[in-house]
Amino acid sequence: MLPAHKHTLETLLADTVKQVALASQGASEAAFVSPTITLERPKVAAHGDVACNVAMQLAKPLRANPRQLAQQIVDALLAQPGARDLVEAAEVAGPGFINLRLTAAAKQAVIAAVFAEKERFGRSQRDAGKHVLIEFVSANPTGPLHVGHGRQAALGDALSNVLASQGWDVHREFYYNDAGVQIQTLALSTQARARGLAPGDEGWPASAYNGEYIADIAKDYLNGATVAASDGEPVTGARDVEDLEAIRRFAVAYLRREQDMDLQAFGVKFDQYYLESSLYKEGRVEKTVAALIAAGKTYEQEGALWLRTTDDGDDKDRVMRKTDGTYTYFVPDVAYHVAKWERGFTKVINIQGSDHHGTIARVRAGLQGLGIGIPKGYPDYILHKMVTVMRNGEEVKISKRAGSYVTVRDLIEWSGGATPGSEVDVDLIDEETIRRGRDAVRFFLISRKADTEFVFDIDLALKQNDENPVHYVQYAHARICSVIAECKARYNMDESTLADVDVTPLTSERAMALLNKLAEFPDMLQHAADELAPHAVAFYLRDLAGEFHSFYNDKAERVLVDDAAERNARVALLAATRQVLANGLATIGVSAPVKM
C-alpha cells in the first residue's frame, strides 16, 4: 500500500473507531483515548491486502465481544465518505481481525506514483534533520582487506543508503588502527623482507606477516617509490633497511593505499578517515584516562590501572593501563567515541565482527564513567558473523595476495570471472569483470542478516541462471529493458507517454500481485531503516523479481499484443517495475544492467 493511502486509511479507521467507541460506551469525546491503529499485511494473501487488530485492542476496555465490535467498525468504515475509493471489501476474521481488500484503482495508483517520483520513489524526509555517524570496515593497515571487512563494507554502505533514503544526514567513517603492536609487527615484517629474508628463514620474525604483499612493500621501499592514501601525505621509501620508523611510515601508507584500491573496486566511499594515532597526538587518550581517574571510576591493583566496568553491567572490571605503562586496546576506543560525541554525533552505529562483542560493555562503561551526558547504550552496534568462501565444493582459506586469508579483491575478481590464482592489480582487469564481481559480492554479503554466518559460494556467484540471486534480480531489470526496446521498435512507442497511459486494464491476479509488491517498497525502506536491516532490501528485490517473472512468464499476460490498451498498460507496469528494481539495487550499491 502506498504511504499516502496508508495514512488516509489510518485516519479513516481512527475516526471510525472513535465513532463506534463513543456510541458503545456513551462517554464524552474529551474522555476518549484513541488506540494505536496498526495496519499490516495478512500472512495469507487470500485474507486480503490489509489487516487491523484494533477491535481486539478495544474489546476489553469497552467490555465488548471483539468479533461483534470488529463488525461494527467494518460497517461504519464502509459508510465513511471516501472509504470506498480505497476499500473494495472488508470482513471480520478469526478472533476479531479486520481484513480489508483494496480497490483496483488504489493498487494501480502505484504506477503513477513511480512515474512521478522516479528515482526518488520509496524515499522520504521522515527523518530529515537527524544526523548519524556510521563507522565500518575500520581495518588495521597491516594487510589487504579480508572478506570479513567486505561484509562490513557491504553492510555499512547499504545501511548508509537506507538511512539516507529516509532523510538522515549520514556520515561514513573509517577508523584506522594505526598504532599498537600490530603496526610494529608490520614494520618488522617489511624490514625482514627488505633484508632478503622470507618466511621460514633463520631470523624471520616469529609473529611476522607472511603474505606476498609484504615483499611488494619492501621492494617499493627499497626502490624509493612514493605512496599515499587518499587522505594522506605522500611517503617516499627511504631505502634504509635499518630505519624502522621510516619503514613503518612507508608500510602504513602503502597498505592504506592498497585498502583504498580495495574499497574503490568495491564502490565504497567514506566521508572521513580517523586515525587512532591522532588520539595520542592530540592527547585525547591521556585526557580520557585522567577524567576517569578524577571521576573515581578507576583503581590501582598489582601495578595496573583498572576501570570499574562492573558499575555499568560488565561481568568484571577491566585493565586500562598495563604494568608496562601501555594502554589496553579498548582505552583509545573510549577516547575515540568521546571525539564522536564532541563532534555532535548523538547517534552512532558501529559495524564490527562478532569477535568484538566483548568490547561493547567496556567502551560503554568508560563513556558512562566520564559523566559527560552520553546516554546509556551509546553507541549502537551491528555485529556480523564470519564469512566462509567456497569454491568447487571446498573451503578457500588462503590466497596468493594475502597468504593466510581471502581478500575482498580476490572475491571481487573471482566472482567476476577472473581465473583463481591469477590475482593482478584491479586496474589491469577489465571493467566489466570488476562490475560483475562487485555486484555479486555486494548483493551476496547483505542477502543474510548480519548475525548469521554466511557461506559465499564462488560457483553460485558465477552462474548465469535463476539460482544466482543477483542474476535473478538483475535479469528482471534487463529483461524489462529489452521488452520496452522491442515495443519502441515494433509499435513506435514513445516511452515518455507511459505516465499518461490508462492502467485500468491491469486487473488480473498476476498484475495485482506485482502492483502490491511495488507499493510495498516505501514501507520496506522505512522498516529497513528502523531496524537497521539492509538485508531487507535484498529480500524485497528477490521477491519483486519473482513477481515480475511470474507475471511475464504467464501467457495470459503477454506484453507484445495487438490490443493497444492492454499492451500499453502492461508496458507501463513493466516500466514502473524497472524503476523500482533500479531504485532498490542502487540502495545496496548494485548496478541495474540494461542487457545481460
Swiss-Prot record:
The keyword 4Fe-4S does not apply. Keywords: Aminoacyl-tRNA synthetase, ATP-binding, Cytoplasm, Ligase, Nucleotide-binding, Protein biosynthesis. Its EC number is 6.1.1.19. It comes from the Bacteria. SUPFAM superfamilies: Anticodon-binding domain of a subclass of class I aminoacyl-tRNA synthetases, Arginyl-tRNA synthetase (ArgRS), N-terminal 'additional' domain, Nucleotidylyl transferase. The keyword NAD does not apply. One of its GO terms (biological process) is arginyl-tRNA aminoacylation. CDD domains: Anticodon_Ia_Arg, ArgRS_core. GO terms for molecular function: arginine-tRNA ligase activity; ATP binding. One of its GO terms (cellular component) is cytoplasm. Its main location: cytoplasm. A motif ('HIGH' region) lies at residues 139-149. It is found in: Cytoplasm. It catalyses: tRNA(Arg) + L-arginine + ATP = L-arginyl-tRNA(Arg) + AMP + diphosphate. Monomer. Belongs to the class-I aminoacyl-tRNA synthetase family. This is Arginine--tRNA ligase. It comes from Paraburkholderia xenovorans (strain LB400).
